[in-house]
Amino acid sequence: MMNSKQTLFSLLMCVLALTSCDTQKQATVGNELALTRAKQTLDSLYLNYSVSGTCLLRENYPSNIGEYTATYLASEEQKNMPNLYSYLWPYSGTFSAVNALFATTGDKEYKSVLDNKVLVGLEEYFDTRRTPEAYASYINSAPQSDRFYDDNVWLGIDFTDTYMLTKEPKYLQKAQLIWNFIESGTDDNLGGGIYWCEQRKESKNTCSNAPGSVFALKLFEATKDSAYFVKGQRLYEWTQTNLQDSTDYLYFDNINLNGKVDKAKFAYNSGQMMQSASLLYQFTGQEKYLTDAQNIAKGCHNYFFQDYTPENGKPFKLLKKGDVWFIAVMLRGFIELYQADKNGTYLDSFSKSLDYAWGHARDEKGLFNTDFSGKTQDNRRWLLTQAAMVEM
């Protein structure tokens, strides 16, 4: 007789056998305009952010290197250091962007861009001086920089997606190497969970744990190793227990080691929990996960969109001004949920917002502001914003 773990594994294998590996590919029929816009935006990105003689990119346009301070780092010293090149996080957005174009079109041109441009530049951040090996927040030729678990999780997801598209083992090997680093950032404090930064283990953040769950579940799909499923499920449950707002089903930002919760709400955190719940529903068929995902989706639609009426136009739901890459990651959750319930309401809101942004938030160089209404302009255009627009 099979034990419970064997039974679960057998059921999961049946689900995977019935689930096409092509679910991450979006149908191109009817999306020609969106695809053309994505290609144009990628061209604008490389035209305006490339650094001659390298595969690296600037962080902003215009660059104004001495005037820019990255606000998303842990180290004050590193924050105030002028950098010629983008930090890892904004650079990594190009991986997701090119992956999305490759997945959508199947065009080997994007596989070439990935292998010969994106991943060549990415390896400039790969740190082999510390163990486990992982990607650092800045290039290796500079002084040693912090390593973030969330930065690496996003890359692990991308490498796994590329493996699922190509079945080339080198991508899966890199994803599994990254997973080893992620696991090194877990312990029993607060009952589990992944820290945010390797050098400053002071908090466990939704931005590490929610995508950590997605990453593990994708690795399960790629390898059929049920250990990844168990880890992904546990990360989902830990994050839900410790960081969900029970009033609207959205997710808070982090919990420190004293148990104090930072109650800021960002689109990507809730979006990744929506995606994880949708994957868990896909793999188990348990309705509670579908309900979880649908509750988060409703909360996100209410919180991150606004009622907007353009001049001489019909009212619609427009994405609020904010971090555009956070919005792109939230969209991943809505896409995954759509695979389960076929409710197109939320994707329609995204489509209308992106269409409006094309006409109102895009400048003469083909770069986007963060205010999709077009009422305010950014002083500089962030690399990660442009990559996010390509992905969406």
Predicted regions and their residues:
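Bacterial N-terminal signal peptides that target proteins for export
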Residues: 1-9
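C-terminal motif of bacterial Sec signal peptides marking the signal peptidase cleavage site
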Residues: 17-20
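Bacterial lipoprotein signal-peptidase II cleavage site
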Residues: 22-27
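CBM-like carbohydrate-recognition segments
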Residues: 29-97, 101-150, 204, 295, ...
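Well-ordered alpha-helical scaffold segments within catalytic/enzyme domains
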Residues: 92-108, 154-168, 211-225, 272-286, ...
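Extended ligand-binding groove/face enriched in aromatic
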Residues: 111-219, 226-230
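Active-site cradle of extracellular carbohydrate-active enzymes
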Residues: 207-212, 216-219, 228-280
